[in-house]
Curated annotation (Swiss-Prot):
It comes from Bacillus licheniformis (strain ATCC 14580 / DSM 13 / JCM 2505 / CCUG 7422 / NBRC 12200 / NCIMB 9375 / NCTC 10341 / NRRL NRS-1264 / Gibson 46). GO terms for molecular function: demethylmenaquinone methyltransferase activity. This is Demethylmenaquinone methyltransferase. GO terms for biological process: menaquinone biosynthetic process; methylation. Its EC number is 2.1.1.163.
């Protein structure tokens, strides 16, 4: 039986959850933490803010949001992998302002206009439909609030672009096999990264989702980028 994208992705993350954090550091050469820190600086989250972290995984960005919003903030992390959430639960035990929810990014279980910020980090490329998820994120953010995506992207510089795809297609899956015994799963991750829209194309999807003043900020030669859009 041919698996849907959603089924395949769910299987990937249910399997790799124990090594996910370690592999993120290996694959990105620890750059993903710097990218997230720079994104948080762009967002400028105040104390007491409300935020939803979609596809929160093991909770790193959820925790960063909670640290910024403080004890008076209200942060929710949502993911469809119970195994990934189990790691997030361990990491967020001391955060009373964080609530973790098992749910689907395609149908967010929240009313319209609920959050000041809605984020998704390295998760959008894995959903069945990018635009549907962006529309859902735009729906639940408050007017004037921010929808923020940190994701792998497509470098445009000749030479660097070719090296990037060589790394993702051949070397990254080998790292998965070596460090996490998961060659097949990390082969999927390189496929999803390779097929993901470039920065300009993703910015257009943000606008199609109804967001305004869309900006994007490339990192490390364009191997990753943050996109920010505001709700009208």
């Amino acid at each position: 039986m041919v698996q849907s994208k959603e089924q395949r992705v769910h299987g990937v993350f249910e399997k790799i959850y124990k090594n996910y954090d370690q592999m993120n550091s290996v694959i990105s050469f620890k750059q993903h933490k710097k990218w997230r820190d720079k994104t948080m600086q762009l967002m400028n989250v105040p104390k007491g803010a409300t935020a939803l972290d979609v596809c929160c995984g093991t909770g790193d960005w959820t925790i960063a949001l909670a640290d910024a919003a403080g004890e008076t903030g209200e942060i929710k992390g949502l993911d469809f992998s119970k195994n990934m959430l189990s790691i997030a639960e361990q990491k967020t035990e001391s955060y009373s302002q964080i609530e973790l929810i098992h749910g689907n990014a395609m149908e967010l279980p929240f009313p319209d206009n609920t959050f000041d910020y809605v984020t998704i980090g390295f998760g959008l490329r894995n959903v069945p439909d990018y635009l549907t998820v962006l529309k859902e994120m735009a729906r639940v953010v408050k007017p004037g609030g921010q929808v923020v995506c940190l994701e792998t992207s497509q470098p445009e510089m000749f030479g660097f672009k070719q090296l990037y795809f060589l790394y993702f297609r051949f070397i990254m899956p080998m790292f998965g096999k070596l460090f996490a015994k998961s060659f097949k799963e990390y082969s999927w991750l390189q496929e999803s990264a390779r097929e993901f829209p470039g920065m300009k194309e993703l910015a257009a999807l943000f606008e199609e989702a109804g967001l305004k003043n869309v900006q994007y900020h490339p990192f490390t030669g364009g191997v990753a980028a943050t996109h920010v859009g505001w709700k009208r």
